[in-house]
Amino acid sequence: MFFGTFTPKMDDKGRLTLPAKFRDELAEGLMVTKGQDHSLAIYPRNVFLERARKAAAASRTNPEARAFVRNLAASADEQSVDGHGRITISPDHRRYAGLSKECVVIGSVDFVEIWNAESWNQYQAEHEESYANGDDAAFMDFL
C-alpha cells in the first residue's frame, strides 16, 4: 500500500525518483497513466491490468465508459524502476499533468499519484477544510 507525500525533483529528461518505500511494491513492473484532476497515476502492473479488464468488460455498450477505457489504455505506459529508483515521464504525460521540475508524489492507498507542485498545493487549499470538517461521504465510510 502507498502512503505519504514526497517532493522529488524531475530532471530535464523527465526522470523522477520514486520514494524508496514505494519501490518494492512496484518492482514487478508498473503502469503510468493519466489520472484524475490532471495528475498522473502509477499502478503496480498487476493491479492496473485487473482494473483495466474490469473497465473494458463494462464499456462495450456505454459510450462514456468506452471513452474512459480508450483514454486509459491509450495513455498507459508500462515501465520499470531503473537502478537509480527512477521512472521516465513521457512528454505527453508531463504536458497533461503540467509537470516541471517541482513535483509532488503522494500515496493514494493502492496507487501513487504524481502532481505538479503548484497544482497539488491549490488542490489541498481547496479541499483541506472539507476534509478537516469531515464533510466528505467517503470520510464517513472510513469511520
Curated annotation (Swiss-Prot):
<keyword id="KW-0238">DNA-binding</keyword>
<dbReference type="InterPro" id="IPR035644">
    <property type="entry name" value="MraZ_C"/>
</dbReference>
<dbReference type="InterPro" id="IPR003444">
    <property type="entry name" value="MraZ"/>
</dbReference>
<dbReference type="Pfam" id="PF02381">
    <property type="entry name" value="MraZ"/>
</dbReference>
<protein>
    <recommendedName>
        <fullName>Transcriptional regulator MraZ</fullName>
    </recommendedName>
</protein>
<dbReference type="GO" id="GO:0005737">
    <property type="term" value="C:cytoplasm"/>
</dbReference>
<dbReference type="InterPro" id="IPR037914">
    <property type="entry name" value="SpoVT-AbrB_sf"/>
</dbReference>
<dbReference type="InterPro" id="IPR020603">
    <property type="entry name" value="MraZ_dom"/>
</dbReference>
<dbReference type="GO" id="GO:0000976">
    <property type="term" value="F:transcription cis-regulatory region binding"/>
</dbReference>
<keyword id="KW-0963">Cytoplasm</keyword>
<dbReference type="GO" id="GO:0003700">
    <property type="term" value="F:DNA-binding transcription factor activity"/>
</dbReference>
<dbReference type="GO" id="GO:0009295">
    <property type="term" value="C:nucleoid"/>
</dbReference>
<keyword id="KW-0805">Transcription regulation</keyword>
<feature type="domain" description="SpoVT-AbrB 2">
    <location>
        <begin position="76"/>
        <end position="119"/>
    </location>
</feature>
<dbReference type="InterPro" id="IPR038619">
    <property type="entry name" value="MraZ_sf"/>
</dbReference>
<keyword id="KW-0677">Repeat</keyword>
<dbReference type="InterPro" id="IPR007159">
    <property type="entry name" value="SpoVT-AbrB_dom"/>
</dbReference>
<feature type="domain" description="SpoVT-AbrB 1">
    <location>
        <begin position="5"/>
        <end position="47"/>
    </location>
</feature>
<dbReference type="GO" id="GO:2000143">
    <property type="term" value="P:negative regulation of DNA-templated transcription initiation"/>
</dbReference>
<dbReference type="InterPro" id="IPR035642">
    <property type="entry name" value="MraZ_N"/>
</dbReference>
<keyword id="KW-0804">Transcription</keyword>
<comment type="subunit">
    <text>Forms oligomers.</text>
</comment>
<comment type="similarity">
    <text>Belongs to the MraZ family.</text>
</comment>
